Amino acid sequence: MLGDIGEFIRGKRFTKADYADSGVNVIHYGEIYTRYGVFAEQALSRVRPELADSLRYAERGDVVLTDVGETVEDVGKAVAWLGDEKVAIHDHCYAFRHSMNPKYVSYCMQTASFIAEKTKYVARTKVNTLLISGLSKVKIPVPYPNDLERSLAEQSRIVAILDKFDALTNSISEGLPREIELRQKQYEYYRDLLLSFPKPGEAAA
């Protein structure tokens, strides 16, 4: 379960009035499902530097996810933070701090099986809200869970494969919509297939 392999750290609020051309790097929850992909090395927004001490931060390697969204699919959308410096996160974001490959965790959070499990813990009100206490019970596949070195090596191998598919899918600047759609479906199929081995505590089929 996610709660067994890491911890969730909630961000702190900042508003549109706090934005500035320079200052503290921040991730707003709305940017995660509109402007970020699987991972990010640079923040897209900044707030006034005098807010620095009042904010809460994600560190390099954390996976930042949203807890609200207009759709159930948007809720829990994740981005692995790979920037050299920490980044402040909005209070509708959580930083998942763990010891796994951050891109691997981010890819896992995109799979159909994870989304299906995640939806069990979404409170469907005017704004869909993710219950972190529930999300912490969701499992992700951990290769070789009893051998950290081997596990990290396998996570890196899977990430390298998925990175290639992700680059192919998202780097298309021209092409027929049908071709792009087919490539996206192919990517999603192989991503889910690569990440479909038994989760800790489950027996192999």
Question: Where do the language-model regions lie?
Answer:
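Charged, alpha-helix-forming regions
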Residues: M1-A205
